[in-house]
């Protein structure tokens, strides 16, 4: 039996972004609106600090989705769907 699963575990996602980094499409679904965006910086005192740029999005298919870009390696993840 597997152990407990973490809720809202970040999962990799394909994002097409504008030149300024704002998401334009997520998994080939157009972004209708960016509802909110924020920057999280944590663990700055460690050898591997955490820096993420979050976006709360409204997608063309009606879904609301939160994604972030990891500033360390540039990869995109979905946090909540």
Protein language model features and the residues they cover:
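Non-catalytic peripheral regions of nucleotide-handling enzymes
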Residues: 1-81
